[in-house]
């Protein structure tokens, strides 16, 4: 045998060079590269190692054979025992296979050497004949083994047809290689088919059919071939049945009805929908809707429910419930650990309250030594002002709230954010409605009150009257044995102002006001607005911690980073401690007044929490709008077409003013006409507001704001009128007038004249004619009349004739005689009165 290189051997055996080198090394043949040659002795050693490895049967061998080019047969062979090398030939012809394989490998190797050395075409023909010989041997090997009565299975060694066919591929063309592969597979396929139980059963069936005189089997169609392939897969290579084929079972979904009712524990979160609740209780959504209907609530399966309603439904249907804590994220983010910080004393936050024009802002103006009132429209405070005042005895933070009725919510918000309330009462006016309301807010917030009796410089001032009126409302002065300090002041002359500040500081010492000056800041939004060029601006009162420029803050549903801070004097500052009012810029939107302000370290968490709060508000609003009760629905039946609607688009300068105006206008609604504020916001009137007004036929109202140029042009084109106001009373009065114009006028009767019957005449043309004297007003021919007898109406109709002597008259005045003929009525008697009236339209007023 000629020498061969490692690379040539790897090419002939279709192996990687590295893998072949590792295999040679495992057999004890050390080769380092593909150019190294293999001696005949090394080749012999290699063959011996391969044969010894082949003597041990593998655990499992799976081969695949294609049938008719479309179907495929997988043949699986399992061996459990070691094949003996020397077994008698008559026991099994297959035991000679290892020696024949060795001879075949040697012959193929010789053929490879010959093909390498010669390019003769005749040699290629001899190679083909050698392949035919190998195919014949393979066919003999694949013949079925003769079985005895015990059906003894002999082990068949592994047959590698691919190795036999492909070892001399270098000398053959591509078509010859393909032909060799097809021939080998065909031989093996026939061998397997003749050795299967299926083949034997087919032959038995054919023989029985011939004996019975049948025509035999028809040619199998593709469906039968597919079935044949499936049958063959159930047999192994030796005809042994692997297992009984069973038709695939169709999975049938079944439901066993429970004998007893299952009590489930339902987790309820805020805003759960009807469909979600039904799914958690394993019932249909229609069942939940039915329960809601019985409770007097109309709902759909997609409607959100509040937790209280969901709890009632769960209990009604016999289940248990647990409440889901949706504030876990908020508690984790907003909770600040201040255990390592110390508290320090802080300045008191004082809110000035009182009735309109009682001098609240004037008093604060004197304290600050500035002219704030001059800047207020009409001298009326329109929104909360936060100011910090330094005195000789310490600093005081003042919150100035509006006093008129519209700003109830703003006064309530001021009371919640304050430590002390200064109740300003005019000495010449006494206790007024907003004074009582301020007392209620202060008591509800449990805030101590210091009463400032203002305008004592006026001659008509009566402080004792104020004290007695407040005492009737349970505000008892210290001089009467109570706990409320009364101070007489004059915002005009400054009398008593120092005593008032001293009383406030004394009250703050009693309260022992403290706060944390370190750590993340907390506070409350006093006011917010949208400014051109600056964006959302919020006035914030810091209550704890230290607010610094650059902090990430969360205010209600808005978040952002503090880009700039200004104090009450308009100066830029970098940090603000407790009880300090500041103006901040950098929020994503305009927060609502009264929202809590917290500093959050992670901006991503702040954004996530703001989105969660916004979603909750939307869901709550939708749930409130959609929850119609049967009683309201029945009450509103028949009123839909009667009620007039005044649609308004409201824009204001600050959030608090817009909120107050909105509440005041909504209170004006009656059964006949209602106010519908379809949109409200802060900032200038824009073109989008005009477009909305045109689409909804609404009135655009601006409070301390104006329309931009684009909105003005669009308004001129579409015929939209803007109404501007800077005093809230004027706005409310004009809206009242507009609502009155929408009301249908009332019809009222007005008596214009009375005639007394003195004598009755008979006329062939008109019947009874009453000779009358006009004793009051004017009797007109065209007006309706009533006939009164003993001051009781006995007839109502019209006049047929009115004459003065013999002439027809259109009217007869007081003190003159006339003849009156009543149409379709002849029972006129002496002493009766004929009352003449007219119907006039009177405009309704709210």
Curated annotation (Swiss-Prot):
Disulfide bonding pattern of the chain: none
One Pfam family this sequence matches: GTP_EFTU
Entry-linked PROSITE patterns: G_TR_2, IF2
G5: annotated span: 490-492
Domain tr-type G: 345-512
Any one of the GO CC terms: cytosol
Compositional bias per record (Basic residues), positions renumbered to this chain: 207-219
Record region (G3): 400-403
InterPro entries tied to this protein: DNA-bd_dom_put_sf, EF-G-like_DII, IF2_II, IF2_N, P-loop_NTPase, Small_GTP-bd, T_Tr_GTP-bd_dom, TF_IF2_bacterial-like
Record: residues binding GTP: 354-361, 400-404, 454-457
Region (G1): 354-361
Coiled-coil intervals: none
Region annotation (G2) ranges: 379-383
Renumbered residue ranges of the record's region Disordered: 198-219
Region (G4), start-end ranges: 454-457
Protein keywords: Cytoplasm, GTP-binding, Initiation factor, Nucleotide-binding, Protein biosynthesis
Gene Ontology MF: a single term: translation initiation factor activity
Stated family: Belongs to the TRAFAC class translation factor GTPase superfamily. Classic translation factor GTPase family. IF-2 subfamily.
Record-linked NCBIfam families: IF-2, small_GTP
Function: One of the essential components for the initiation of protein synthesis. Protects formylmethionyl-tRNA from spontaneous hydrolysis and promotes its binding to the 30S ribosomal subunits. Also involved in the hydrolysis of GTP during the formation of the 70S ribosomal complex.
Protein name per the record: Translation initiation factor IF-2
Primary gene name: infB
